[in-house]
Amino acid sequence: MLNRYPLWKYVMLIVVIVIGLLYALPNLFGEDPAVQITGARGVAASEQTLIQVQKTLQEEKITAKSVALEEGAILARFDSTDTQLRAREALMGVMGDKYVVALNLAPATPRWLAAIHAEPMKLGLDLRGGVHFLMEVDMDTALGKLQEQNIDSLRSDLREKGIPYTTVRKENNYGLSITFRDAKARDEAIAYLSKRHPDLVISSQGSNQLRAVMSDARLSEAREYAVQQNINILRNRVNQLGVAEPVVQRQGADRIVVELPGIQDTARAKEILGATATLEFRLVNTNVDQAAAASGRVPGDSEVKQTREGQPVVLYKRVILTGDHITDSTSSQDEYNQPQVNISLDSAGGNIMSNFTKDNIGKPMATLFVEYKDSGKKDANGRAVLVKQEEVINIANIQSRLGNSFRITGINNPNEARQLSLLLRAGALIAPIQIVEERTIGPTLGMQNIEQGLEACLAGLLVSILFMIIFYKKFGLIATSALIANLILIVGIMSLLPGATLSMPGIAGIVLTLAVAVDANVLINERIKEELSNGRTVQQAIDEGYRGAFSSIFDANITTLIKVIILYAVGTGAIKGFAITTGIGVATSMFTAIVGTRAIVNLLYGGKRVKKLSI
């Protein structure tokens, strides 16, 4: 019989729409200002931590909507941002640096919806507000560090082999030259070092010199490593900030994009992400007196560094260990109530420190704090010129063989200790980064974008509904129900997809798909009217109308989907957001126009003697 659906099709349609509605509902409940407490590396939030948080809030007379332990983190919700800020200040003072206390916006989804993992759509920066950074890796510094490592490595190899040399100098293009006493020593060094360092191109220069430069493959590998490692370290630092759904991705050869939606403390984010602090551990050269140190007359294997008070200290150039080997660090107070940072090393770092200290017991070792800061000047390309700042923060005699754990003192105050421990815990950047573009979108502007987007969607929907009802009467009402179902399904699917983020271009995609859905219904209705004018019966006209329109609707939507797939494959950011919502909308509009409206029409007219259609 014409225009009849089996029961399973009606059940399927109802189930799909109900599921879409359930997963779209969380978007109606908004968000609560919240404070999120997560454990730092190696520490997890527990029931005991939850009790401590509740007690602190009670003592400070701060009222929370709820405080709960969820998936290893504590989430405290508040009625206003003022209360949220007060709570964060109170909790930061109590929790210490074993926990990350971060401002956040938590979905106010009811528990019964959360139980089925129904969550609101993830909103992009333009809708939720937040901060966007475009960072550039300082490749010159990265390759300069590698040049220093090559110098140290070649010196060590020549000493080990017993080949005498007089001087080692830096050359252009991150190369180096070594001067020997005679050509014989130089030739012996070239033969030995070429085997030991296949990534260096070593050649003779002059009568008694060799020149070593990094191969193109090694330079390319070093650049790639610098960017990739900085991305990993920035991700660790973002985790320390406790930001939900951050974006950290590469852009071009030496740039990194960081997007932090919903973040409220942008100054703190900039400080943590852009910080370049690390530590170097070096032996103090006690053979040079203070007068020589003050005048800078020191041996070639040493250099003068300053303490915070401006006192000169002569350190050997050889670096025993850098912050790259630090796996964990926490701040605390020593027996004299002075701030200190407790350091834990990886196995390789522990072995280096152990082997070095066992042979140097009784000698002073210095902790050198190294940081790159903006000089306020610009280079020829308009980029900020970074200045390397070094400061001896601690000198201590090696009293025993050190292993994987030790502590450093000489830090000014607890805040500085906490900041240093956080940076060391997240990892030292392989090369300094410069923030070349910063864009902050406030929550007010984000809310304005949401309101404008909703207005655009509703306006498009209302105009479409009016058009359909005026032109197609009862069939226009049926098409209207399909449009509403289409919008519900788009929002529900967007909320379900873990990687989908809604942005302003995404809203444009939704508005576009509403137009596509109207187009499909217009095709169907016009085809039915055409069949009726050709003398078909009502039942035949409905059946032929849907059959005849199907191929046109299918072809048009498939070509649109192909374009959407191409946009998603080659596009970035906003283009991908537009492609996702458009693709989802095209699929749901086909479903609601072909299956949804047909189901309603079949219920109303299927198997009945109808002489005239309201179309």
UniProtKB/Swiss-Prot annotation:
Keyword list, A-Z: Cell inner membrane, Cell membrane, Membrane, Protein transport, Translocation, Transmembrane, Transmembrane helix, Transport
Topological domains, Periplasmic: 30-455, 498-501, 581-585
Keyword Hydrolase appears in the UniProt entry: no
Main location: membrane
Keyword Transmembrane helix attributed: yes
Tree of life domain: Bacteria
GO terms, biological process: intracellular protein transmembrane transport; protein insertion into membrane from inner side; protein targeting; protein transport; protein transport by the Sec complex
Region Required for protein export: start-end pairs: 279-426
Gene Ontology cellular component annotations, sorted alphabetically: cell envelope Sec protein transport complex; membrane; plasma membrane
InterPro entries (alphabetical): SecD, SecD-TM, SecD/SecF_arch_bac, SecD/SecF_CS, SecD_1st, SecD_SecF_C, SecD_SecF_C_bact, SecDF_P1_head
Role description: Part of the Sec protein translocase complex. Interacts with the SecYEG preprotein conducting channel. SecDF uses the proton motive force (PMF) to complete protein translocation after the ATP-dependent function of SecA. The large periplasmic domain is thought to have a base and head domain joined by a hinge; movement of the hinge may be coupled to both proton transport and protein export, with the head domain capturing substrate, and a conformational change preventing backward movement and driving forward movement.
Name of the protein this chain belongs to: Protein translocase subunit SecD
Organism: Escherichia coli (strain K12)
Gene coding for it: secD
